[in-house]
Amino acid sequence: MVLLDSLGKRVNFLNAVIPELGLKEIRAVHMRAEDGGRAPEFREKFDCAAARAVAPMNILLEYCMPFVKKNGHFIAMKGNAEEESYENALQELGGKVELEDVFTLPESDFARRIICVKKNHFLSTRYPRKAGIPRKSPL
């Protein structure tokens, strides 16, 4: 398992905690998703990628789908608020929503959504675009 984060402080913390917890076959990597998605070591190498709600879904798709193998899955946890359309990003990045479920976390009143996207084909080398572009000009 690879944990990817653009913030070095978080990665350093995770790398300190992983051995303390006795976790095996897990590592934290300091890298932006846009760069990781282009790196041969990570591109289309994972059966599954997951992300928390750090960006709108169309941007998350561009960040995460490059890591997922063909026929693999991307799982996003989002808030329950209505969101802008991400159909264009799904089509461009070869994804199809297989499951969307709304739930409430225990001891919380906040609803969350889990969105599971299956990747149906290999990704064009156009994606992910350079750092910052997905946010400035979303699909």
For the regions a language model picked out, list residue spans one by one:
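Short alpha-helix immediately C-terminal to the canonical SAM-binding loop
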Residues: 10-12, 82-86
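Conserved beta-strand segments of alpha/beta enzyme cores
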Residues: 25-27, 73, 96-99
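Helix-to-beta-strand junctions that scaffold the AdoMet/dcAdoMet cofactor pocket
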Residues: 68-70
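A short SAM/SAH-binding and catalytic strip from SAM-dependent methyltransferases
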Residues: 46-66, 75-76, 80
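Short "lid" loop at the C-terminus of a central beta-strand within the Rossmann-like core
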Residues: 34, 56, 79-83, 105
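Cofactor-binding loop segments of dinucleotide-utilizing enzymes, especially the Rossmann-like FAD-
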Residues: 6, 79, 119
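Conserved SAM/SAH cofactor-binding pocket of Class I
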Residues: 1-53, 61
